């Protein structure tokens, strides 16, 4: 059963990697990421490099928007955002851990790294809505 869940998770991630362009714009992934993934040739190590570079960009984006939202929130809002962010981090880490099944090999590493990136970009996009 565990093997089946790993195969399903990896398969879904690889399918998602193929269909990134529309989602990229929606969640704010950089054009550099698209170019890098296009040039990766489907080689896992190259794809992981692309994901790693984009994750750094998205982590910085998330940290910036989080600070901006906190700076404009009242005390009650700051407390709610802090609690929500802590809960989100806990969920993200558990979810990524599921994708990084140790029995899944390099594909699971790719799936976990991609999941972390996508969740980070999605969270940044969610918080950016509070600035509008």
State the predicted function of each range.
Residues 1-8:
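Bacterial N-terminal signal peptides that target proteins for export
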Residues 8-16:
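Bacterial N-terminal signal peptides
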């Amino acid at each position: 059963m565990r093997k089946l869940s790993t195969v399903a998770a990896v398969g879904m991630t690889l399918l998602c990697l193929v269909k990134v362009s529309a989602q990229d714009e929606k969640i704010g992934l950089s054009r550099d990421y698209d170019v890098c993934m296009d040039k990766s040739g489907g080689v896992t190590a190259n794809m992981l490099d692309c994901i790693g570079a984009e994750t750094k960009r998205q982590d910085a984006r998330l940290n910036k928007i989080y600070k901006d939202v906190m700076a404009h929130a009242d005390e009650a809002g700051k407390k709610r955002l802090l609690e929500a962010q802590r809960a989100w981090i806990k969920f993200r880490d558990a979810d990524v851990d599921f994708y990084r099944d140790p029995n899944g090999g390099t594909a699971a590493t790719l799936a976990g790294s991609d999941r972390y990136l996508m969740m980070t970009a999605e969270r940044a996009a969610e918080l950016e809505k509070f600035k509008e």
